[in-house]
């Protein structure tokens, strides 16, 4: 898969009409988990802790569970290809009520402070943010994570001043569920407020790493960029017909700031 649509080698300076997909003053709506934060370690360790706790709980009842812990590569492959959590639990050696017990532990674990600290900045994000800032393009984060969590993360990496606004959730458990209707509602609120503040969002794009991000952008007729560095694979994302698929935020910004020929 190519990250960016290949361009003609013809010098753009020799062509009369050229334009940019994103120009100075425009707004880029961007998801947080996946495009900006690498959450793979946190999600995998949440899985491991939930599996271990379930096994220990049954051991206290004198019941030995034949647990098979997946490797991180196996686990993340399943997550990227939208394998249900029930199937992941089944592959891990659980069945019946054991699966229910395992799944009930995840929401409480995934937002523990000790696990949140495992999130890492995706490669190339700092340069991508700087590129957008230097071009006068505003970054507005639309996420199902709590805004306070996002802001803490951005401060940790000295990136908070590069973001114009954060639209997040009040509920800490909303992000893991990643329901499309929630992302649509968040993006709708973000667009409405940006317009009230006097910013034109008609040329905006939506960038994200899940079907929820793509569907939200499409709901408001925004072109969408799907990133494969997060929790969904390229093959899965293409099924939702995004405008373009890129590897990460860095390649997405390159794509969005390249000149295109006006016909």
Segment roles from a protein language model:
Residues 43, 121, 180-183, 187, ...:
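Conserved donor sugar-nucleotide recognition element shared by glycan-biosynthetic enzymes
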Residues 111-141, 147-151:
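Short, acidic loop-to-helix structural element flanking the phosphoryl-transfer center
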Residues 42, 120-124, 145, 209, ...:
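Short beta->alpha linker loops
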Residues 16, 22-123:
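N-terminal helical cap/lid subdomain that shapes the substrate entry/recognition surface
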Residues 126-133, 191, 214-218:
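Surface-exposed amphipathic alpha-helices with a cationic face
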Residues 35, 42, 147, 212, ...:
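Conserved Rossmann-like nucleotide-cofactor binding loop
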Residues 206-245:
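Acidic, Mg2+-coordinating phosphoryl-transfer loop and its flanking beta/alpha structural elements
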Residues 140, 147-205, 218-219, 236-238:
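Substrate-recognition "cap/lid" segment bordering the active-site pocket of phosphatases
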């Amino acid at each position: 898969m190519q990250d960016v649509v290949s361009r003609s080698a013809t010098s753009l300076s020799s062509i009369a009409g050229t334009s940019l997909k994103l120009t100075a003053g425009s707004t880029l709506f961007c998801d947080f988990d996946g495009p900006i934060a690498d959450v793979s370690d946190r999600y995998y360790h949440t899985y491991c802790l939930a599996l271990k706790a379930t096994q220990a709980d049954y051991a206290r009842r004198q019941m030995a569970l034949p647990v098979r812990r997946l490797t991180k590569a196996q686990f993340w492959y399943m997550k990227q290809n939208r394998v249900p959590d029930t199937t992941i639990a089944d592959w891990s050696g659980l069945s019946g009520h054991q699966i229910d017990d395992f799944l009930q532990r995840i929401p409480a674990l995934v937002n523990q402070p000790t696990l949140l600290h495992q999130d890492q900045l995706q490669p190339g994000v700092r340069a991508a943010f700087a590129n957008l800032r230097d071009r006068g393009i505003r970054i507005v984060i639309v996420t199902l994570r709590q805004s306070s969590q996002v802001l803490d993360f951005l401060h940790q990496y000295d990136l908070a001043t590069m973001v114009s606004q954060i639209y997040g959730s009040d509920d800490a458990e909303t992000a893991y569920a990643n329901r499309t209707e929630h992302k649509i509602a968040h993006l709708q609120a973000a667009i409405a407020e940006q317009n009230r503040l006097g910013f034109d969002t008609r040329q905006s794009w939506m960038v994200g790493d899940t079907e929820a991000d793509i569907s939200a952008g499409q709901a408001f007729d925004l072109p969408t960029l799907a990133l494969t560095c997060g929790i969904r694979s390229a093959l899965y994302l293409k099924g939702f017909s995004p405008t373009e698929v890129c590897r990460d935020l860095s390649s997405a910004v390159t794509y969005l700031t390249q000149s295109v020929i006006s016909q």
